[in-house]
């Protein structure tokens, strides 16, 4: 932090504070810290980066399969334990990556073909897939089907790169059985915000956790998400800024030197007088792994979840119970009891819910847990 002509310059940097490449067989976990940030910057960056991680990072997946001898998805094959539908679900779970592991360099988006030719008895796994030389399976032991006798299993696979669950081609254009592929390599992403330095100051720290399926590292996923956001904002840059603002009022021109992006850090010049009235978030404890140059103090824990922030701007009680994302059985039981919104649900106690047909103690506990975690609401035990 450097003081210049009445202004405070904050130089924010990303640091990897925890890396677990062998978190489990199919997950790579990393935690990153970005600091120092001004108040509200951490929330803005955290929401944007998390959204980009889950929807903008490219991955490779099987998009369709042509199974020899299969008439339709619900048919069975002689000598094969699994139905065609189960085989397709197993193929959907196969995790594929570039052979060199360099997922930052995207493929050319053309369609690739792979094949399976196996003869039983035995278990057919991802190891039996004959991939093109440029791609391979992350977990070769992933099960596909079980052959009970000397039956032969022949499958032609169609593979493509994409983003999240979006695919431009339609089901009609796919050969064989369509597979609802999920391309995203990022399995989970969370962030939390912590205060650093003087409790009356304007500095915050952003902690970002990323889990990937090992097709690329969390650091590579973060790089892709960052690049995607830069490209997006470059495309939607307002064209009138430079035309309508005079040079003396053009904020972009005034701060062009301090706001330049370079490497893994960026600078931001902000007047203290204009930011002292900014809204302060509650302070939280800082993990021991992080030792930045600024002085750290421990305050009340305030992990800020995205759902909680979004729900502050809507009338939660008028939301449908579908927003609780309960199991279909629980949701149907509530709707049959004419409980269609969260407001309807809050009119019931836990004891009242137990009187609903097929609604047991575990169902009540699940509803209470979701209300508490997502909406900070409680169901009264009794009236």
Swiss-Prot record:
Its main location: plastid. Residues 306-383 are annotated as: Alpha C-terminal domain (alpha-CTD). Keywords: Chloroplast, DNA-directed RNA polymerase, Nucleotidyltransferase, Plastid, Transcription, Transferase. It holds the Pfam family RNA_pol_A_CTD. InterPro entries: DNA-dir_RNA_pol_insert (IPR011262), DNA-dir_RNA_pol_RpoA/D/Rpb3 (IPR011263), DNA-dir_RpoA (IPR011773), RBP11-like (IPR036603), RNAP_asu_C (IPR011260), RNApol_insert_sf (IPR036643). It catalyses: RNA(n) + a ribonucleoside 5'-triphosphate = RNA(n+1) + diphosphate. Its EC number is 2.7.7.6. GO terms for biological process: DNA-templated transcription. One of its GO terms (molecular function) is DNA-directed RNA polymerase activity. It is an enzyme of class 2 (transferase). Gene3D superfamilies: 5' to 3' exonuclease, C-terminal subdomain (1.10.150.20), DNA-directed RNA polymerase, insert domain (2.170.120.12), RNA polymerase, RBP11-like subunit (3.30.1360.10). It is found in: Plastid, Chloroplast. Residues 1-240 are annotated as: Alpha N-terminal domain (alpha-NTD). One of its GO terms (cellular component) is mitochondrion. DNA-dependent RNA polymerase catalyzes the transcription of DNA into RNA using the four ribonucleoside triphosphates as substrates. Belongs to the RNA polymerase alpha chain family. The N-terminal domain is essential for RNAP assembly and basal transcription, whereas the C-terminal domain is involved in interaction with transcriptional regulators and with upstream promoter elements. In plastids the minimal PEP RNA polymerase catalytic core is composed of four subunits: alpha, beta, beta', and beta''. When a (nuclear-encoded) sigma factor is associated with the core the holoenzyme is formed, which can initiate transcription. This is DNA-directed RNA polymerase subunit alpha.
């Amino acid at each position: 932090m450097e003081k210049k002509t009445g202004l405070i310059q904050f130089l924010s940097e990303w640091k990897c504070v925890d890396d677990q490449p062998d978190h489990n067989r199919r997950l790579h976990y990393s935690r990153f810290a970005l600091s120092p940030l001004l108040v509200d910057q951490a929330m803005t960056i955290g929401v944007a980066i998390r959204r980009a991680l889950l929807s903008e990072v490219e991955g490779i997946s099987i998009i369709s399969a042509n199974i020899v001898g299969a008439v339709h998805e619900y048919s069975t094959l002689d000598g094969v334990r699994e139905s065609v539908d189960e085989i397709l679900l197993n193929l959907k779970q196969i995790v594929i990556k570039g052979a060199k592991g360099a997922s930052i360099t995207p493929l050319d988006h053309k369609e690739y073909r792979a094949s399976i030719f196996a003869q039983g008895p035995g278990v057919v796994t991802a190891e039996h897939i004959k991939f093109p030389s440029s791609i391979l399976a992350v977990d070769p032991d992933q099960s596909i089907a079980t052959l009970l006798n000397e039956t032969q299993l022949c499958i032609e696979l169609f593979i493509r790169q994409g983003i999240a669950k979006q695919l431009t081609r339609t089901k009609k254009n796919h050969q064989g059985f369509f597979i609802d592929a999920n391309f995203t390599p990022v399995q989970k992403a969370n962030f939390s915000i912590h205060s650093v330095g003087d409790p009356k100051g304007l500095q915050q720290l952003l902690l970002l956790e990323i889990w990937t399926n090992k097709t690329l590292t969390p650091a590579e996923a973060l790089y892709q998400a960052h690049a995607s956001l830069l490209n997006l904002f470059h495309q939607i840059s307002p064209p009138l800024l430079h035309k309508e603002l005079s040079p003396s009022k053009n904020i972009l021109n005034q701060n062009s030197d301090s706001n330049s992006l370079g490497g893994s850090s960026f600078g931001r010049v902000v007047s203290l007088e204009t930011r002292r009235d900014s809204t302060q978030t509650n302070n939280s404890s800082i993990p021991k792994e992080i030792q930045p140059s600024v002085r750290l103090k421990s305050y009340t824990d305030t992990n800020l979840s995205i759902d909680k922030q979004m729900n502050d701007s809507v009338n939660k009680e008028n939301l449908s119970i579908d927003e609780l994302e309960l199991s279909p059985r629980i949701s149907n039981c509530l709707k049959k009891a004419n409980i269609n919104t969260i407001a309807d649900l809050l009119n019931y106690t836990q004891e009242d819910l137990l009187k609903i047909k097929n609604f047991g103690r575990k169902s009540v506990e699940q509803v209470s847990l979701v209300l508490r975690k997502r909406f900070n609401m409680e169901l009264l035990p009794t009236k």
